[in-house]
Amino acid sequence: MSKFTWKELIQLGSPSKAYESSLACIAHIDMNAFFAQVEQMRCGLSKEDPVVCVQWNSIIAVSYAARKYGISRMDTIQEALKKCSNLIPIHTAVFKKGEDFWQYHDGCGSWVQDPAKQISVEDHKVSLEPYRRESRKALKIFKSACDLVERASIDEVFLDLGRICFNMLMFDNEYELTGDLKLKDALSNIREAFIGGNYDINSHLPLIPEKIKSLKFEGDVFNPEGRDLITDWDDVILALGSQVCKGIRDSIKDILGYTTSCGLSSTKNVCKLASNYKKPDAQTIVKNDCLLDFLDCGKFEITSFWTLGGVLGKELIDVLDLPHENSIKHIRETWPDNAGQLKEFLDAKVKQSDYDRSTSNIDPLKTADLAEKLFKLSRGRYGLPLSSRPVVKSMMSNKNLRGKSCNSIVDCISWLEVFCAELTSRIQDLEQEYNKIVIPRTVSISLKTKSYEVYRKSGPVAYKGINFQSHELLKVGIKFVTDLDIKGKNKSYYPLTKLSMTITNFDIIDLQKTVVDMFGNQVHTFKSSAGKEDEEKTTSSKADEKTPKLECCKYQVTFTDQKALQEHADYHLALKLSEGLNGAEESSKNLSFGEKRLLFSRKRPNSQHTATPQKKQVTSSKNILSFFTRKK
């Protein structure tokens, strides 16, 4: 029998549970030297051209062709030109002070001798929008191929391939293993058991059929010990996933022209290490039985893991007395049995009298979680879920000001125009990426004076409608800098050395929700017709007994399915919203008797001259849009 269970296999079909399975197939795809590739494509250059992307005097991206000359991001552009005489430097797009649009200035930059071709740091601000735009195009391709995509940064994503691999395994009838053997024939037994329900959820899967061992991996399988490539179902899933990733990466290359590097494994942390293992334009697969070989290959330490590369990772090296080499293996061998051993050691260290808690990044109340994380990370088994939801807490646009680039309130407003344009672009980026409406409700202005004093002012932003409006943001920003400008009478105020605008407190509205989802079930007018009276009645029809009947209280209309009832509920809610916008008629069933007397008392005829009022003709159309058209 396999060492994996039916439960672990079926978990792949759940986006929220797949990462917990030992059969999980997670990919990390990184676009190589992304900014440099974007500029290569924009300028019609080849992959062999040595291109660097420049921001003022600094290099922010180096193409792989330029790296052959020993150029890195640590070099200045002048140093890089000395290493490669035919280097092609390209400056990022920039905003100009007072303008709400960015543009390129090709052929201009700090490396050009002509003063007219210099890009002034004082009057310009870097724009990353061209790279965000290309990132959105790539993300669209990723999402069209995979149902769960997490955008890790502007140039990298995680993919959960669980559903794709599961469907290929169980339902793909066209996939060919060899010229005369299809996947469905090799997997006929497990497919029949699954479709027929002839299995116990906690029982082990059958052994893989001999024929499936001809399944090929796409990419480089990390296998220094020369183990058999396919021995169990986890290898089958990874092999299928590798072929899916190859297809996705080919689409990125064919459609956008960008090369990528990919890592595949059963966890996010390991596949991220794998994507960086071999670059550019490569794909590395780490099988479960090769995890320890991969982690101990000499290229990784505990600080190589995602979230442990900063001060926490460095502190852990000191606290756990880890060696600077083979630190991952050291954790496994020092605490071999369980995470509890590691927790006891951490607790003892934290309680030592010479341990400075004021500067520590280790929470003494969360050592159990940290120990569990380290224990599993060192074994390549620390699973994390993928999240496709936007987690937006704040956005900031700022400028470190030089010279007299912000010497008055007029200069402040000119920079705010740039900030608002940049923030608007980033909000639109989020809205397109997640198909949601994103509305910041709070804006904050922060500035640093000539004497390095910091002043801040924040407050709410009001919009006319539900969409974000840049001019409303600018209006509030101008008000705040004007209020702060009162302090500008002090000689130590201007010129400013820093100015920033931050937006927070986001409302995120899902565009895919229905009217009722958006406003909540405000009109609770529907109930099942089955009540106490029905319980006392008998019926001769068994079909009627089994069929639930749902009824509208206002019109006594009966529905036999929930969908029809919900559509009728939408109609009532739209009608009520329309009456709130355009006014109600006397015949409205949303008004009580008292409300009708209050609102329509002027229309009531006196008792001496009664007449039968003519009923207003009601159209048969109940299109929801008609309720939001103001009556003339």
Curated annotation (Swiss-Prot):
<dbReference type="GO" id="GO:0042276">
    <property type="term" value="P:error-prone translesion synthesis"/>
</dbReference>
<dbReference type="InterPro" id="IPR043502">
    <property type="entry name" value="DNA/RNA_pol_sf"/>
</dbReference>
<keyword id="KW-0548">Nucleotidyltransferase</keyword>
<feature type="binding site">
    <location>
        <position position="553"/>
    </location>
    <ligand>
        <name>Zn(2+)</name>
    </ligand>
</feature>
<protein>
    <recommendedName>
        <fullName>DNA polymerase eta</fullName>
        <ecNumber>2.7.7.7</ecNumber>
    </recommendedName>
</protein>
<dbReference type="GO" id="GO:0003684">
    <property type="term" value="F:damaged DNA binding"/>
</dbReference>
<dbReference type="GO" id="GO:0005634">
    <property type="term" value="C:nucleus"/>
</dbReference>
<keyword id="KW-0237">DNA synthesis</keyword>
<comment type="function">
    <text>DNA polymerase specifically involved in DNA repair. Plays an important role in translesion synthesis, where the normal high fidelity DNA polymerases cannot proceed and DNA synthesis stalls. Plays an important role in the repair of UV-induced pyrimidine dimers. Depending on the context, it inserts the correct base, but causes frequent base transitions and transversions.</text>
</comment>
<keyword id="KW-0238">DNA-binding</keyword>
<dbReference type="GO" id="GO:0005739">
    <property type="term" value="C:mitochondrion"/>
</dbReference>
<keyword id="KW-0863">Zinc-finger</keyword>
<comment type="similarity">
    <text>Belongs to the DNA polymerase type-Y family.</text>
</comment>
<feature type="binding site">
    <location>
        <position position="568"/>
    </location>
    <ligand>
        <name>Zn(2+)</name>
    </ligand>
</feature>
<dbReference type="InterPro" id="IPR041298">
    <property type="entry name" value="UBZ3"/>
</dbReference>
<dbReference type="GO" id="GO:0009314">
    <property type="term" value="P:response to radiation"/>
</dbReference>
<feature type="domain" description="UmuC">
    <location>
        <begin position="26"/>
        <end position="309"/>
    </location>
</feature>
<feature type="region of interest" description="POL30-binding">
    <location>
        <begin position="625"/>
        <end position="632"/>
    </location>
</feature>
<feature type="binding site">
    <location>
        <position position="155"/>
    </location>
    <ligand>
        <name>Mg(2+)</name>
    </ligand>
</feature>
<keyword id="KW-0808">Transferase</keyword>
<keyword id="KW-0227">DNA damage</keyword>
<dbReference type="GO" id="GO:0008270">
    <property type="term" value="F:zinc ion binding"/>
</dbReference>
<dbReference type="GO" id="GO:0070987">
    <property type="term" value="P:error-free translesion synthesis"/>
</dbReference>
<dbReference type="InterPro" id="IPR036775">
    <property type="entry name" value="DNA_pol_Y-fam_lit_finger_sf"/>
</dbReference>
<dbReference type="GO" id="GO:0003887">
    <property type="term" value="F:DNA-directed DNA polymerase activity"/>
</dbReference>
<dbReference type="GO" id="GO:0005657">
    <property type="term" value="C:replication fork"/>
</dbReference>
<keyword id="KW-0539">Nucleus</keyword>
<dbReference type="Pfam" id="PF00817">
    <property type="entry name" value="IMS"/>
</dbReference>
<feature type="binding site">
    <location>
        <position position="552"/>
    </location>
    <ligand>
        <name>Zn(2+)</name>
    </ligand>
</feature>
<keyword id="KW-0479">Metal-binding</keyword>
<feature type="region of interest" description="Disordered">
    <location>
        <begin position="598"/>
        <end position="632"/>
    </location>
</feature>
<dbReference type="GO" id="GO:0007059">
    <property type="term" value="P:chromosome segregation"/>
</dbReference>
<keyword id="KW-0235">DNA replication</keyword>
<dbReference type="GO" id="GO:0035861">
    <property type="term" value="C:site of double-strand break"/>
</dbReference>
<keyword id="KW-0239">DNA-directed DNA polymerase</keyword>
<dbReference type="InterPro" id="IPR043128">
    <property type="entry name" value="Rev_trsase/Diguanyl_cyclase"/>
</dbReference>
<keyword id="KW-0515">Mutator protein</keyword>
<feature type="zinc finger region" description="UBZ3-type">
    <location>
        <begin position="545"/>
        <end position="580"/>
    </location>
</feature>
<keyword id="KW-0234">DNA repair</keyword>
<dbReference type="InterPro" id="IPR017961">
    <property type="entry name" value="DNA_pol_Y-fam_little_finger"/>
</dbReference>
<feature type="binding site">
    <location>
        <position position="30"/>
    </location>
    <ligand>
        <name>Mg(2+)</name>
    </ligand>
</feature>
<dbReference type="GO" id="GO:0007064">
    <property type="term" value="P:mitotic sister chromatid cohesion"/>
</dbReference>
